[in-house]
Every structure is written in C-alpha cells, then in structure tokens.
Amino acid sequence: MSSSKVAVVTGTNSNLGLNIVYRLIERSEPEDNLTIVVTSRTLPRVRECIDLIKAFVNTINRTGSVDYDYLLVDFTNMISILDAHYSLSKRYDHINYFFVNAAQGVYSGIDWLGAVKEVFSSPLEAVTNPTYKIQRVGVKSKDGMGLVFQANVFGPYYLIQKLLPLLQAGQGTVVWVSSIMSAPKYLSLQDIQLLESDVSYEGSKRLVDLLHSATYKEMKKLGIRQYLTHPGIFTSLSFFQYLNVFTYYGMLFLFYLARWIGSPWHNIQGYKAANAPVYVATMANPHFEKEQMKYGSATFRDGLEYIKTDEVDTTGCEDVYKYISNLKLQWDEKLKDQIKPTRIPL
C-alpha cells in the first residue's frame, strides 16, 4: 500500500545534502509518493538543487511520484526561521523526515605552514583531525547570537520545536548530522555560543551531540525518533575556495591513502557520506538501534560502505539543554508579534 511522505532536508544544496536526498529516494518504498522540501537561502540554489534531483529521479525505477517543494530559510535569522515554520505548517499536515544538515562555518583560510608540518609529521591525523583551518573568532549574527551557534545548533533546534505537531502527525524521524570532529575539547560550557572559540564549527558539532543526548528521550515520548549521525570525511564544496588544483588533488590523494592504511572514516564521496543519515531514517529498527549512539558513515579499504557506531560522552548535556531551552523561551517572547495576521490564510 502506497503512502505519502514528506522530507525536509536542510542544507540541500551542499554535497552531503543532495546525496541525502538521492539515497532517501533510493531507500524509500518504490510505491511511496515522496515530497522533497529543498531548503536554501537563495532561490537560484533551490532551482539548481531541484534540477539535479529531477535528473537523478529520471535514472531510477519507481512507481510512486517524487514531488518538489522549497523553503527559503536562513538559520542565522530568527524571523526567517519563524517564517519557515509558518510556511511548512500551512502547506503540510505531517512531516516524516527532518534532516538537520546545517554546516556553516566562519573560515578565513588555511595555515599552509601548519598544514605542511601536519601532513609530513602525521599524514593520517592531518586529514582526519586537522588543526590548520583558520576560523574567525567572535562572529555574531544580525540577531546578536554567535553565528555558527545559531546556524548549526539553535536555529535548527528552534524550527524543530515549532514543527513538533507536524513531526508527531508523521511519526517523524529527526536526523542530526554531527561531525567526526566533535570531541569535548572543542567546547567550553562557559562559551556555549562559541564567541570566544577559534574552533567554532567543531564546537557547534559538540553542541549537536549534547543537545541530541539531552532531548531524544523526550522526542521518543512524542512518537518522534531522533538519531545522531556523522558523515565521516568527504569532499565538501564549501572549502574548495581555499584550494587550487594541486592542493585539491593532493588532498584527494591523502584521503585515499588514509582509507588504504585503515581509516574507516574517509568516505571521500558525498554519496557514501550520506549513508548513515539515511540509514537511521529509513532502515534503523527502533527496537535495536539505540538512539543514544552516534551512527557514522564508514568504508572499508576497498570502498565498501558500512555503518559504524560510537558512544557519546554526554558530560554537560543538561547544562547545554538548560541554556538552549531558556534561550528558546526568550526568542518565543521576542518573536510573538513578528508574524502578522496577513500571513494567516483567510
């Protein structure tokens, strides 16, 4: 029996986001009617994404339809997030999948001297846990919050909280995409908005780990499954601006070398990186797969993909949850009069 399912994928225009959509379409029941809600900050990127997804759908056999919708949302703008909530609530009565693929950073370049030293002293570590990416410190959004904190953590969390009725109606699954680089060392609990951090991107992914750990049980009580994943290491389009043709292919060579000498995390292709996020959404058995674990996309030396799980150090999760919950209440109050009656259908 066919069903109608709705999937919202944030950051759809990224390498990982597109491949999450591809794999989701592949792994869904062929008779299901799917609606893919593409999200981006700009309309041209939305159109580009939808064209790519349509081309992919034309290469596979399925009896169910694939429909396309879009959502223009900027997770560093709370009014935009609230507008996204109203837009989705007006269009849909349920959401089945919500992928949090937010991955904004404030990079300013590469410490090339440091990179060369790392590559020669420890090549595997250099392409697994690099320390030579330069990130700006103290960058705030127009809302006055830490930009990376808002884009990758608080903004998506706020939207999910607003969409709980739709997720409940769809017996939905929320999939947080974290990172292999989300160790406790990247976050100070005295700097939850990451304004004093020179590793704000990694710190935001540590916050994702802790926020998931603090909330998945409550989500389960609502009939919503929530999983924590990471894509391993792959070629990300966002960092290409800092590479030339030589450094790009040098990076690829080191990625393949790392995989050959035994790293499970060098998936390299975005398609393989999307394995874990789509696996937990479509194939995970809620009676077997534990929501407190972190599910990673992994590959063997020959490129054969598999799922690798890790435990999460939850130290500080209640502190993070308390801080973000209080911040949500503050923004509820600030935004209560932002949506005008003209937005409500007559």
UniProtKB/Swiss-Prot annotation:
Sites where the protein binds NADP(+): L16, T39, R45, Y201, K205, S236
Annotated catalytic residues: S178, Y201, K205
Keyword Lipid metabolism: yes
Name of the protein: 3-keto-steroid reductase
A GO cellular component entry from the record: endoplasmic reticulum membrane
GO molecular function terms noted in the UniProt entry: 3-beta-hydroxysteroid 3-dehydrogenase (NADP+) activity
EC identifiers of the protein: 1.1.1.270
PANTHER family: 3-KETO-STEROID REDUCTASE ERG27, DEHYDROGENASE
The species this protein was found in: Kluyveromyces lactis (strain ATCC 8585 / CBS 2359 / DSM 70799 / NBRC 1267 / NRRL Y-1140 / WM37)
